């Protein structure tokens, strides 16, 4: 049930009937204050200016033509022409009952599209670090939401599995394999990479062999390919453990590394030349883009092949977009990559559009995000200034959560304590990120994210268990609830309206890739439930009918919180 869409359509029809153009926008919004109703339509002023009418007069005409019988109990006009809509409690109650009887909480599936979502993208032979957190968990929340709405979502883990560094890595893997130390060395990818780099820098013979392996690997040599595949497999097996800990839906089958596009690159360069988009410049192959200017004010030159024949990341990204449209049949392509890569993507996509590889009808969207900062406002690092490994961050989250939970539940058995620490600790790390606008930098703060107060995972998880516990205390099975939902108290009505706004929050996340909108919705819902719980006795209601009604509101709240948190990739438990 999308109230916003319903009201927008109704008000637009009335606007058109009042003389507004067919493409006018009603600008319906959820009201910030109860005195202005449940929804406001703010589009009258702009349309009145177009029509040369006093806004108040147009608003009166629209309200006179507006048919909200059975939907709104009152419609009034405020100020110069704001239309305030107060929803009818009986209408709300009917839709709450429908949501309660629906496995999807009354949310309809949409017309399915094939949507490719590019996220996570770690590098082979390197451990995942905190810099991978935002792409991985924001991208996964987007994927979960789009899938829930009925889209065919293709997860694309654009792993860095190609490049000149692989000659060095293969040469070192060969060296340690000969010494029987391969498994031990590969157990710490970071150490393996550093040792390989040290050998490359200090041993000329090793470096020469490494450079030779680069050429052989790129030429398809089977031995080098076999060694390369081992490096990829070991890395992704370790990454999969991290994804599982994070409750992220990526699997090995979702890996679409840079190497996937290698065979396309010569054809891309030849095609761009044939179309007159790429030219030779100082031995390199370059695309000059009028849409972007360099420091001298001249068209920006984008190198797609160096004079030594090597291809660049841009060439791979052009091929990648082409593949996603032509082979994967994408209707929409979304990239969760940090904001520093924005110009790089814009250059690649401009070439993609000019070459006709992806039509304008297929959106290419960069859902960029800011950096993770420490409390000092600087990029989040170890005290020594090094990069924090993701496994170490998650280990600390679990230990902090274990101490927190143990302090609140001294008698809890070890197994339940470990499970609860996992849910709370991982949930805290994820929710702290997801609850902030992805376009801004955010400060990583253990104390805030593990607090049981405010918009945090522990608060939200506790809110769910609190609602769920009501049923245990009621002694009544969920399936045995009977009777109509009655909305008499103000707190009941406010909770009812918010419950029915879940679809609006989900639709926003699906459109804009902004999970913080869903977090804000769920937090607001939890706060409204607290007010309802405080002012409207549930188990000790005045009569049986009211008790049944309020239990139904509690049940729908629990299901909504659980579904919303699940879409964010946050687990819930029945007891905390």
From Swiss-Prot:
InterPro entries reported for this sequence: aa-tRNA-synth_I_CS (IPR001412), Arg-tRNA-ligase (IPR001278), Arg-tRNA-synth_N (IPR005148), Arg-tRNA-synth_N_sf (IPR036695), ArgRS_core (IPR035684), DALR_anticod-bd (IPR008909), Rossmann-like_a/b/a_fold (IPR014729), tRNAsynth_Ia_anticodon-bd (IPR009080)
Q: Which GO terms describe its molecular function?
A: arginine-tRNA ligase activity; ATP binding
Instruction: Please give the superkingdom of this protein's source.
Output: Bacteria
Classification lineage: Bacteria, Pseudomonadati, Pseudomonadota, Gammaproteobacteria, Enterobacterales
Quaternary arrangement and interactors, per the entry? Monomer.
Q: Motif ('HIGH' region) spans which residues?
A: 122-132
The similarity comment for this entry is: Belongs to the class-I aminoacyl-tRNA synthetase family.
CDD domains, from UniProt? Anticodon_Ia_Arg, ArgRS_core
Which locations, inside or outside the cell, does it occupy? Cytoplasm
Which keywords belong to this entry?
Aminoacyl-tRNA synthetase, ATP-binding, Cytoplasm, Ligase, Nucleotide-binding, Protein biosynthesis
* Gene, per the UniProt record: argS
Catalyses which reaction(s):
tRNA(Arg) + L-arginine + ATP = L-arginyl-tRNA(Arg) + AMP + diphosphate
Specify the protein name.
Answer: Arginine--tRNA ligase
Name a biological process GO annotation: arginyl-tRNA aminoacylation
């Amino acid at each position: 049930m999308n109230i916003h869409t319903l009201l927008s359509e109704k008000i637009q029809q009335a606007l058109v009937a009042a003389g507004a153009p067919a493409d006018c926008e009603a600008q319906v919004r959820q009201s910030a204050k109860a005195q202005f109703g449940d929804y406001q339509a703010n589009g009258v002023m702009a349309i009145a200016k177009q029509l040369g009418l006093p806004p108040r007069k147009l608003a009166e005409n629209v309200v006179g033509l507006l048919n909200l019988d059975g939907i709104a109990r009152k419609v009034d006009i405020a100020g110069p022409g704001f239309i305030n809509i107060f929803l009818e409690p009986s209408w709300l109650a009917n839709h709450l009952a429908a949501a309660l009887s629906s496995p999807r909480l009354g949310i309809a599936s949409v017309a399915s599209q094939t949507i490719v979502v590019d996220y996570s993208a770690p590098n082979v032979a390197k451990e995942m670090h905190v810099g991978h957190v935002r792409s991985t968990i924001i991208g996964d929340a987007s994927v979960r939401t789009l899938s829930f709405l009925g889209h065919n979502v293709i997860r694309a883990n654009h792993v860095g599995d190609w490049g000149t560094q692989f000659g060095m890595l293969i040469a070192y893997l060969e060296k340690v394999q000969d010494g029987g130390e391969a498994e031990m060395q590969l157990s710490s990818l970071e150490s393996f990479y550093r040792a390989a780099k040290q050998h490359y820098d200090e041993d000329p013979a090793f470096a020469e062999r490494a450079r030779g392996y680069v050429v052989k690997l790129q030429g398809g040599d089977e031995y080098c390919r076999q060694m390369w595949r081992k490096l990829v497999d070991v890395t992704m097996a370790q990454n999969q453990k991290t994804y599982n800990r994070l409750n992220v839906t990526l699997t090995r089958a979702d890996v679409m590394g840079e190497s996937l596009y290698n065979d396309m690159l010569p054809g891309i360069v030849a095609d761009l030349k044939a179309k007159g988009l790429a030219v030779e410049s100082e031995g390199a192959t370059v695309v000059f883009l009028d849409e972007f200017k360099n420091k001298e004010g001249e068209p920006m030159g984008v190198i797609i092949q160096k004079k030594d024949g090597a291809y660049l990341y841009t060439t791979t990204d052009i091929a990648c977009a082409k593949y996603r449209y032509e082979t994967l049949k994408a209707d929409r392509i979304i990239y969760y990559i940090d904001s520093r890569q924005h110009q790089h993507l814009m250059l690649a996509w401009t070439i993609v559009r000019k070459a006709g590889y992806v039509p304008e009808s297929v959106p290419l969207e960069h859902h960029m995000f800011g950096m993770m900062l420490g409390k000092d406002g600087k990029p989040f690092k170890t005290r020594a200034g090094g990069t924090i490994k993701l496994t170490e961050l998650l280990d600390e989250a679990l230990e902090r959560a274990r101490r927190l939970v143990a302090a609140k539940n001294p008698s809890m058995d070890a197994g339940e304590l470990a499970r609860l620490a996992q849910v709370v600790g991982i949930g805290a790390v994820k929710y702290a990120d997801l609850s902030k606008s992805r376009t801004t930098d955010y400060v990583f703060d253990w104390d805030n994210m593990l607090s049981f107060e405010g918009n945090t995972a522990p608060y939200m998880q506790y809110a769910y268990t609190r609602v769920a516990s009501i049923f245990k205390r009621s002694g009544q099975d969920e399936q045995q609830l009977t009777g109509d939902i009655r909305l008499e108290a103000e707190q009941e009505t406010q909770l009812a309206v918010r419950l029915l706004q879940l679809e609006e929050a989900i639709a926003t996340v699906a459109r804009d890739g902004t999970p913080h909108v869903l977090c804000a919705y769920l937090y607001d819902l939890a706060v409204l439930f607290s007010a309802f719980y405080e002012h409207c006795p549930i188990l000790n209601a005045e009569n049986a009918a009211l008790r049944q009604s309020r239990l139904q509101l509690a049940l729908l709240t629990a299901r909504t919180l659980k579904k919303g948190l699940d879409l964010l990739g946050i687990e819930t438990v029945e007891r905390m």
